[in-house]
Curated annotation (Swiss-Prot):
Domain (SMC hinge) ranges: 515-629
UniProt disease annotation: Cornelia de Lange syndrome 2: A form of Cornelia de Lange syndrome, a clinically heterogeneous developmental disorder associated with malformations affecting multiple systems. Characterized by facial dysmorphisms, abnormal hands and feet, growth delay, cognitive retardation, hirsutism, gastroesophageal dysfunction and cardiac, ophthalmologic and genitourinary anomalies. Developmental and epileptic encephalopathy 85 with or without midline brain defects: An X-linked form of epileptic encephalopathy, a heterogeneous group of severe early-onset epilepsies characterized by refractory seizures, neurodevelopmental impairment, and poor prognosis. Development is normal prior to seizure onset, after which cognitive and motor delays become apparent. DEE85 is characterized by onset of severe refractory seizures in the first year of life, global developmental delay with impaired intellectual development and poor or absent speech, and dysmorphic facial features.
GO annotations of cellular component type: chromosome; chromosome, centromeric region; cohesin complex; condensed nuclear chromosome; cytosol; kinetochore; meiotic cohesin complex; mitotic cohesin complex
Ranges of Low complexity composition bias in the record: 953-966
Keyword Coiled coil: yes
Domain comment (free text): The flexible SMC hinge domain, which separates the large intramolecular coiled coil regions, allows the heterotypic interaction with the corresponding domain of SMC3, forming a V-shaped heterodimer. The two heads of the heterodimer are then connected by different ends of the cleavable RAD21 protein, forming a ring structure.
Keywords associated with the record: Acetylation, ATP-binding, Cell cycle, Cell division, Centromere, Chromosome, Coiled coil, Disease variant, DNA damage, DNA repair, Epilepsy, Intellectual disability, Kinetochore, Meiosis, Mitosis, Nucleotide-binding, Nucleus, Phosphoprotein, Ubl conjugation
Organism name: Homo sapiens (Human)
Effect of N1166T: In CDLS2; uncertain significance
Basic and acidic residues composition bias: residue spans: 284-293
Superkingdom of this protein's organism: Eukaryota
Name the record gives this protein: Structural maintenance of chromosomes protein 1A
């Protein structure tokens, strides 16, 4: 049997660089402290054996490279190789390399694919998927805690039967589905057999029904022939009467034409005058608008001039203040220059005096060379004797110099502070002047602002009042327009409606008595509930304009085109062709004629209303409307109260979403008064709009007031800032500087006292040093003729010090005056720049004021000219209005003449209308009868034409499409008039009936007979007339279903066979593993327990298909009774889990077994038993590589591999190997030592 010989690792996890681990003995233990990298060694073995990355405790392959988890990878690659040794064969090397983000596999240094790599390992008994070669840390406890289902999953994984689970489920579903299909086709076949029997019975019933139906058809033909015959007789009679009346009307028309021509000429003249009047009104509006635009420009120009004048006054004051300040600053600078000249003069006089004194000195203490040498020697000797005193004096000198520097610094600071106080006083003076100037500007601005606010208030009140009134007018106009027009129309629609109303008023004024108005304005539903229904029936004709004649209609159309108005529909009363109202329809229950629920005024517009409504019926609900429309022998046009319309042709249209809004237009009352009110409100709106146009002037004033207010606000803010910030800050800084200046005196005095005190101490030291010098220089002083050596030394130095001190005083004075002079020069330049700037500002403002005054005069002149032009236009408008009124009076007289002639014509037209109505009704009746015959498939005997010549369009739908609809219906009637019916089949007795009562009686008799036959037919349940076709269809379906059933049965058999095959293969795999483990587990458990009384056994919950349910595992510990696995102690559970683990390994065992801390949960007794068992098995069955932390365990091994950590950026694992075979097991129980 082969074994794992060596492991070579390079940069894998905690193993940095290349390390060779091994050789591995048959029983090798891996030891080391926690965190040293023991488990990483097990991960390396798992890695080289093809384990997935997710099981190696990392997310990506790159994380396996040493240092990668902390962002410092040791290299860009890592590898692990394994040397596998087998008796009688050459060693083989298996390697896995991390290159980039992927793995590379090698066998004996040859790169191979993963599947080849896996196959070679499987040949050695190493199953990568089953992981039969290793046990991870904690796996023993996990196995001990598994429930039966989890144990089944473990066996599925080991036996690889789980690989077939997906295919097993798929085949099972296919088998179940095939069986269901078979069952379904069986029931379907059974049902179709029943249908075949039923179809035979239906065919017999259909034959009997057809015979009765033929008898009914013959009765229907007889009834329809009777109705049509008498209808044609009546139509011929009415046509003769109508021709006579039309001749009389033609004569009256010629008389009216002459009057109409005269009226037309007057209308043209009036139209021209009104256009001229409108043009003048347009020009007045334009001039008024122009004037409103010019006024704000004039106001703005005037305001700009006023503002610039105020600005100039402020600039002049600023110039005066700047000049005054400049003169004062110039005087201060002159004083400083005089003082500077005075100091320079005093310095020169001092220098001249010193020069004279130097020349006038007689005595000169000059030593000979030997005396100089002697002086230096004696000086050195004196220094040595007084060294201690000299050092002490030197220390005093250093301290004295430091204090003198402090004194000079304080005095310099005092001078600077005095200069700063002087500067602050000047700044305070400037602040106070600025405050005075700002207060003066604020007072002036407030006065201007009050004036602007007053003007703004007046304009605001005027504009707001105009706005409020405009809102009120608009609300009233909206209410009027809502009543006059559609409630949902938007502003554009309101404007459009207003335009249409204006045109309507114009044509009524131009054609009085000829133009009656819109249909909606001339009629009203009798009750509110009929509003929607009437709206639906009238449709587009609601807004149609009713005129007396076609000629008037064409004149109106021409006028509308000239005015560029929208297209309108006209209904000329002399042109419309209407059918008479069918009186029988008034007898129908649950329905009323639409024309009967409408009130109309004047009466002579009835023809237009008849044209729009036809014989339409209104019903309370949709069900009644549908029943009446299609339920009887004759179809009718009906409408429900909710607006649902049923056409004779079968078309049904529901109530549109805007139908209710349109229907609300019927609620308007006193339309004429509302129109007058609308005109009045429109005129008032124009006047108020003129006032509202002052809003531009108001905005200009508001803008100026806002600008002035903002300037005032900024000035007040500047004043407040100057007072509370600049002035207060300067005063505060001045006080602070004065306080500092007051503190300089005591500090300077303190320093002077310290210096004076130290001078006394230095004087005492000096006297002691002088005593030493006097002793040393006593003889030398006698030689040169001085009292002491200091007299000789000071004679030269004293004079020089006095001169230097005086010169320093002069330099300090010059420096101080120079600094002040430079400061004053800079301030003087700033003052001079301010004077220049204000001079330029004054000059610029004066030029701008001159320009602004000219601009103001120009605007005033334009306003005066515009006002004059406006007044001239108003005068023209009044004159033109008077001319229009005169022309209207002339036209009124002509219209009166035309009205008289029109009355005579109206009387004749009424008679014609009555005849035409009856004639139209008869034609409509004939059309409806023919249409009903065609719809009901009643074959009439025709001598000319065919049934296809009968139109299916509705005969009474004239109201739907205005004049074009009327022409269409007339063409239908004309086409149907060409159809000649053969009345040969009609009994002569029926033809001879003349009186209306006699005709009605005969018709009722025929109808009653037909009703009885239809009643018999209706009592018979309508059979399936296609029974024969159904019978043939059912026979075909039966054969088809039989074939499908047989095919489904074969598919089910095939699916079952496929399922049984995969089921057997899965069972064989699982059972082979299970039987092997179940056979070996008892023996292994006895060996682990070291007791033959121990028992372990496995049992499947489902013996037929064990992989579908759990596997029970029970053990009886030595010397104990049977207890469930959960009741075993921790050690007993671990031993039982190990027994199961080793038993599973015995099925297709791998050549080596890697275990990670399997002894973790074992006590000392069980550790020894498990270690001995592994040791025994490693000699013959498998190689064991165990990670352990317990000495009782790893001392049983043949070799040890020690892992220890080294610290770096991350843990670095190092390895030691130790061969225990060289050391016999002298103490098998280490605990006794």
């Amino acid at each position: 049997m082969g074994f794992l010989k060596l492991i070579e690792i390079e940069n894998f996890k905690s193993y940095k660089g290349r390390q060779i681990i091994g050789p591995f003995q048959r029983f090798t233990a891996i030891i080391g402290p926690n965190g040293s990298g023991k488990s990483n060694l097990m991960d390396a073995i798992s890695f080289v054996l093809g384990e997935k990355t997710s099981n190696l405790r990392v997310k990506t392959l790159r994380d396996l490279i040493h240092g990668a988890p902390v962002g410092k990878p040791a290299a860009n690659r890592a590898f692990v190789s394994m040397v596998y040794s087998e008796e009688g064969a050459e060693d083989r090397t298996f390697a896995r390399v991390i290159v980039g983000g992927s793995s590379e596999y090698k066998i004996n240094n040859k790169v191979v694919q993963l599947h080849e790599y896996s196959e070679e390992l499987e040949k050695l008994g190493i199953l990568i998927k089953a992981r039969n070669f290793l046990v991870f840390q904690g796996a023993v406890e996990s196995i001990a805690m598994k429930n039966p289902k989890e144990r089944t999953a473990l066996f599925e994984e080991i036996s690889r039967s789980g690989e077939l689970a997906q295919e097993y489920d798929k085949r099972k579903k296919e088998m179940v589905k095939a069986e269901e299909d078979t069952q379904f086709n069986y029931h379907r076949k059974k049902n179709i057999a029943a249908e075949r029997k039923e179809a035979k019975q239906e065919k017999e019933e259909a034959d009997r029904y057809q015979r009765l139906k033929d008898e009914v058809v013959r009765a229907q033909v007889q009834l329809q022939l009777f109705k049509l015959y008498h209808n044609e007789v009546e139509i011929e009679k009415l046509n003769k009467e109508l021709a006579s009346k039309n001749k009389e009307i033609e004569k009256d028309k010629k008389r009216m034409d002459k009057v109409e021509d005269e009226l037309k000429e007057k209308k043209k003249e009036l139209g021209k005058m009104m256009r001229e009047q409108q043009q003048i009104e347009k020009e007045i509006k334009e001039k008024d608008s122009e004037l409103n635009q010019k006024r704000p420009q004039y106001i703005k120009a005037k305001e700009n001039t006023s503002h610039k004048i105020k600005k100039l006054e402020a600039a002049k004051k600023s110039l005066q203040n700047a000049q005054k300040h400049y003169k004062k600053r110039k005087g201060d600078m002159d004083e400083l220059e005089k003082e500077m000249l005075s100091v320079e003069k005093a310095r020169q006089e001092f220098e001249e005096r010193m020069e004279e004194e130097s020349q006038s000195q007689g005595r000169d203490l000059t030593l000979e060379e030997n005396q100089v040498k002697k002086y230096h020697r004696l000086k050195e000797e004196a220094s040595k004797r007084a060294a201690t005193l000299a050092q002490e004096l030197e220390k005093f000198n250093r301290d004295q110099k430091a204090d003198q520097d402090r004194l000079d610094l304080e005095e310099r600071k005092k001078v600077e502070t005095e200069a700063k106080i002087k500067q602050k006083l000047r700044e305070i003076e400037e602040n106070q002047k600025r405050i005075e100037k700002l207060e003066e500007y604020i007072t002036t601005s407030k006065q201007s602002l009050e004036e602007q606010k007053k003007l703004e208030g007046e304009l605001t009140e005027e504009v707001e009042m105009a706005k409020r009134r405009i809102d009120e007018i608009n609300k009233e106009l909206n209410q009027v327009m809502e009543q006059l027009g559609d409630a949902r129309i938007d502003r554009q629609e309101s404007s459009r409606q207003q335009r249409k109303a204006e045109i309507m008023e114009s044509i009524k004024r131009l054609y009085p008595g000829s133009v009656y108005g819109r249909l909606i304005d001339l009629c009203q539903p009798t009750q509110k509930k009929y509003q929607i229904a009437v709206t639906k029936v009238l449709g587009k004709n609601m807004d149609a304009i009713i005129v007396d004649s076609e000629k008037t209609g064409r004149d109106c159309i021409q006028y509308i085109k000239e005015q560029r108005g929208e297209p309108e529909t006209f209904l000329p009363l002399d042109y419309l062709e209407v059918k008479p109202t069918d009186e029988k329809l008034r007898e129908l229950k649950g329905a009323k004629l639409v024309i009967d629920v409408i009130r109309y005024e004047p009466p002579h517009i009835k023809k237009a209303l008849q044209y729009a409504c036809g014989n339409a019926l209104v019903c309370d609900n949709v069900e009644d409307a549908r029943r009446i429309a299609f339920g009887g022998h004759q179809r009718h046009k009906t409408v429900a109260l909710d607006g649902t319309l049923f056409q004779k042709s079968g078309v049904i249209s529901g109530g549109a979403s805007d139908l209710k809004a349109k229907a609300r237009r019927w609620d308007e009352k006193a339309v004429d008064k509302l129109k007058e009110k609308k005109e009045r409100l429109t005129e008032e709106l124009k006047e108020q709009m003129k006032a509202k146009r002052k809003e531009a002037e108001l905005r200009q004033v508001q803008s100026q007031a806002h600008g002035l207010q903002m300037r005032l606000k900024y000035s007040q803010s500047d004043l407040e800032q100057t007072k509370t910030r600049h002035l207060a800050l300067n005063l505060q800084e001045k006080s602070k500087l004065e306080s500092e200046l007051a503190n300089f005196g005591p500090r300077i005095n303190d320093i002077k006292r310290i210096i004076q005190s130290r001078e006394r101490e230095m004087k005492d030291l000096k006297e002691k040093m002088n005593q030493v010098e006097d002793e040393v220089f006593e003889e030398f002083c006698r030689e040169i003729g001085v009292r002491n050596i200091r007299e000789f030394e000071e004679e030269k130095v004293k004079r020089q010090n006095e001169i230097a001190k005086k010169r320093l005083e002069f330099e300090n004075q010059k420096t101080r005056l120079g600094i002040q002079l430079d400061f004053e020069k800079n301030q003087l330049k700033e003052d001079q720049d301010k004077v220049h700037m204000w001079e330029q500002t004054v000059k610029k403002d004066e030029n701008e004021i001159e320009k602004l005054k000219k601009e103001e005069q120009r605007h005033m002149k334009i306003i005066d000219e515009t006002m004059a032009q406006l007044q001239d236009l108003k005068n023209q408008h009044l004159a033109k209005k008077s001319e229009v009124n005169d022309k209207n009076h002339e036209m009124e007289e002509i219209r009166k003449k035309l009205g008289g002639a029109n009355k005579e014509m109206t009387h004749l037209q009424k008679e014609v209308t009555a005849i035409e109505t009856k004639l139209e009704q008869k034609r409509s009746d004939r059309h409806n009868l023919l249409q009903a015959c065609k719809m009901q498939d009643i074959k009439l005997p025709l001598s000319k034409g065919t049934m296809d010549d009968i139109s299916q369009e509705e005969g009474s739908s004239q109201g739907e499409d205005s004049v074009s609809g009327s022409q269409r219906i007339s063409s239908i009637y004309a086409r149907e008039a060409l159809i000649e019916i053969d009345y040969g089949d009609l009994c002569e007795d029926l033809k001879d009936a003349q009186a209306e009562e006699e005709i009605k009686q005969e018709m009722n008799t025929l109808q009653q007979k037909l009703n009885e036959q239809q009643s018999v037919l209706q009592r018979i349940a309508a059979p399936n007339m296609k029974a024969m076709e159904k019978l043939e269809s059912v026979r075909d379906k039966f054969q088809e279903t039989s074939d499908e059933f047989e095919a489904a049965r074969k598919r089910a058999k095939k699916a079952k066979q496929a399922f049984e095959q995969i089921k057997k293969e899965r069972f064989d795999r699982f059972n082979a593993c299970f039987e092997s483990v179940a056979t070996n587990i008892d023996e292994i458990y006895k060996a682990l327990s070291r007791n033959s009384s121990a028992q372990a056994f496995l049992g499947p919950e489902n013996p037929e298909e064990p992989y579908l349910d759990g596997i029970n595992y029970n053990c009886v510990a030595p010397g104990k009774r049977f207890r469930p696995m959960d009741n075993l102690s921790g050690g007993e559970k671990t031993v039982a889990a190990l027994a199961l683990l080793f038993a599973i390994h015995s099925y297709k065992p791998a050549p080596f077994f890697v275990l990670d801390e399997i002894d973790a949960a074992l006590d000392n007794t069980n550790i020894g038993k498990v270690a001995n068992y592994i040791k025994e098995q490693s000699t013959c069955n498998f190689q064991a590589i165990v990670i352990s932390l317990k000495e009782e365990f790893y001392t049983k091994a043949e070799s040890l591999i020690g892992v220890y950590p080294e610290q770096g950026d991350c843990v670095i694992s190092k390895v030691l190997t130790f061969d225990l075979t060289k050391y016999p097991d002298a103490n098998p129980n280490p605990n006794e030592q």
